[in-house]
Amino acid sequence: MSLALGLLQSPAAFSQDTAGQLLARINKLTPEKRRDLLAEKAKAEGEVTFYSSMSVTQIETLSKAFNNRYPFIKVNTYRSSGERAIAKIQTELQAKRNAADVINISAAQAAPIKALGALDPYNSPQREFFPADYKDKEGYFTSFYITPIVLGYNTNLVKRGDAPKNYEDLLNPKWKGEMLMDDEPYEWYGVLMKHFGKERGLQYMKRLAQQNLSMQRGRTNVAQMLVAGEGAIGITLSGHSALELKEKGAPLDWVALDPYFAQANMIMLARYAPHPHAAALFLDWSLSEEGQTIVTSFGRVVARNGVKQRFPELMQKKSRLVDMDLIDPKVEKVLTKEFREIFIPTR
């Protein structure tokens, strides 16, 4: 049966109860009854649809591991990030063709999705193993993984002693036309604006924009271009990507500038999930020790207590999560507008 036909026939998509309301009732059962009921209902649903900003390879690895645990649930996946994911979800809501069951995207990008009414709270039993800073009180967001943001540099083009040591160093004329940056680093922008203050922050950003940055789609692309020598410095690299490339012998090293921050990538329940019981099992498993251990195998940092990190050096210098007030939809909208006007005025 096609996904579209499945949605049209799915009572969860059009019933009065949202996915969160349904699962909240199930959560009142004893752990044993809850487990058995979820498994029974999920088996009848037969599938779950996962929207994620992870790489295709990582999504496939995660899906395969989940299938090993729950072979009766097929995992449908959609890989995207940023504004494209938001636009897709908005279009589906308007058309009343809600495909997503579980959504994984950065916290700041999750804000407009929540504002659309596309998310529901879900208090997974696994949430108790996550520190308070890595989940919201209402149950909408739980950290799936954390992405420390680092500055990278091509070691063939930049000597260690010459690499920028702070954000002011990026304004040095010698780096003009030599720097790459992701074109949607809204959390990075928000953290620095809060760190500098509004007036100083805007002055800094305008001066940085005058350095003729090469704006690229996505941090992975920034890292690849940096390794290829198409730039000397990458301002916004994912920490795990930088360390993986360095581990493989690429001419790349990294610096943790101050403020050093980590972007939380959340995992969330879609409000109108067509397969709510399978969604609950997928969420529970993804946040479990087993699921989180697989996520660390990708080099990503996780917040769950007791899970061994692949790259612990990324957390040796204390990082802070993107402040939750930066994730407020109204604040995020202002930050996005400011960033675009400064760095991408022609788009």
Where are these regions (language model features)?
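Immediate post-signal peptide segment of exported/extracytoplasmic ligand-binding proteins
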Residues: S15-T49, N67-N68, L171-K176
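Extracytoplasmic ligand-binding site segments that recognize negatively charged/polar headgroups
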Residues: T49-K64, V75-L93, R97-E230
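A ligand-binding cleft/hinge motif common to bilobed small-molecule-binding domains
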Residues: Q109-P112, A232-P251
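Periplasmic-binding protein-like
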Residues: A132, I146-I149, W175-E184, M205-A209, S214-Q216, S286-K308, ...
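A bilobed periplasmic-binding-protein/Venus flytrap-type ligand-binding module shared by bacterial periplasmic
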Residues: G152-L157, M193-H195, Q263-H275, I294-V295
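Extracellular/periplasmic bilobal clamshell ligand-binding domains
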Residues: R310-R347
